[in-house]
Amino acid sequence: MSAILTDRQAEELHKAIIAYLGVINAPKTAEAFREEANVSANFDDATRKKYEGLLEKKWTSVVRLQKKVMELEQRNQTLQSELDSTTPTSLLRRNQDPASWLPRAPARHTLQSHRSPITCVAFHPVFSSLASGSEDTTIKIWDWELGELERTVKGHTKGVLDVDFGGPRGGTLLASCSSDLTIKLWDPSDEYKNIRTLPGHDHSVSAIRFVPSGAAGSPSSGNLLVSASRDKTLRIWDVTTGYCVKTIRGHADWVRDVAPSFDGRWLLSAGNDQTARLWDASSGEPKCTFIGHEHVVECVTIAPPVSYANLASLAGLKKPPPLSSSAEYIATGSRDKTIKIWDGRGTLIKTLTGHDNWIRSLVFHPGGKYLLSASDDKTIRCWDLTQEGRCVKTVTDAHGHFVSCMRWAPNVIKDVPVNGDATNGATNGLSKKKEEEAAKAGIRCVIATGCVDLNVRIFAS
């Protein structure tokens, strides 16, 4: 008797073997085995039918389990590799430190309702609301914490190309732009009623952003909106009046994206002319042109001050710029499959390669250590600015098709103001420490992505 099986298990196995030998038409072998195994002689047809197929089922179950074990072992190796490539040595510390959090599959929520590809997403600055825009002409408002659709906003007659929340303090608005040549403003506090339509562009409006307010020299009190268009221009709008207050010309082709600096003093744009351009938001005058990409520049982003120390080190500088300064470093993503990091004077610092298709969106980690990218190769990649821009994580199964957009949820609290004019080293050090502590305290570890596969996904800790 086997030491592994109980008497009952051994009897069940023997009967299953006899039934199997009967199925394969080996009666002599079955009879010989019955005698050798001391199986009772009353192994009738009813008993045989009971055990027929049992051995095959057990065998295939074992094969399936072996396959599953191999898959889990492979997954374990992948996770271990990710673990080893991450800088913090303590798993507990990594889980508790928002400044080191990176997205991972699977997504917390997959939001489905759009009928055409997703083009854009945007987080409400206070509430757990997320807006998504689509080629189906609609905007959908979701509760990203619950993963539920709250409402569908209709008004555009062609595809929605970008959305953004912002506006004067205490009066958050949602702005959207479209291939129908218009920008629309919606009031979240009044069931997303369309309160204003801004015509003026002569072609599709590709991107919009509210211009932040509050900094010395900022042209905005929270009521300005900047738009980029296929008509080769940028326009600045006053959302309280609906008037276009400035038109900025300089690009030679379609302007694909625009991003304001955190203090609203600078605007960064890029497009089909394969350049990115930095503009003074007050005067509309160009400050710098970034030349180096070999194809359309799809997306741009301006580095937050919390990343200055890491980017200055990447640039070979001993001392970072003051935290009060803006547009010191930028990043651009292109159809040439590369990401380029520049300083604010147009000097190329680093080219990041690894994506296999167009770069569609860039986001600096609010902790200042990473740059994240989304691409038509269906992945999200995380680049470590403290490791020479090395790709330390790839979310390979982020979506099932081109990842068209990505946004990071805004911080819970505002950054602590710092005195950028201080020249004393200790004072600057204290300011930097306060800045980092405030940034960490406010980081929400939540990312939203949109895709051609009609899905919006929420990646969260």
From Swiss-Prot:
Cellular component per GO, a single term: microtubule associated complex
GO process terms (BP): cell division; establishment of mitotic spindle orientation; microtubule sliding
Region (Disordered): 79-98
Major localization listed first in the record, in broad terms: cytoplasm
Keyword Repeat on entry: yes
Chain intervals with Polar residues compositional bias: 79-93
Domain of life assignment: Eukaryota
WD repeat copies, ranges: 113-154, 156-196, 200-247, 250-289, 292-352, 354-393, 398-444, 446-461
Record's function text: Positively regulates the activity of the minus-end directed microtubule motor protein dynein. May enhance dynein-mediated microtubule sliding by targeting dynein to the microtubule plus end. Required for nuclear migration during vegetative growth as well as development. Required for retrograde early endosome (EE) transport from the hyphal tip. Required for localization of dynein to the mitotic spindle poles. Recruits additional proteins to the dynein complex at SPBs.
PANTHER family per the UniProt record, alphabetical: TRANSCRIPTION INITIATION FACTOR TFIID (PTHR19879), TRANSCRIPTION INITIATION FACTOR TFIID SUBUNIT 5 (PTHR19879:SF9)
Description of its domains: Dimerization mediated by the LisH domain may be required to activate dynein.
SUBUNIT field: Self-associates. Interacts with ndl1 and dynein.
Protein name per its UniProtKB record: Nuclear distribution protein PAC1
Organism: Pyrenophora tritici-repentis (strain Pt-1C-BFP)
Gene: pac1
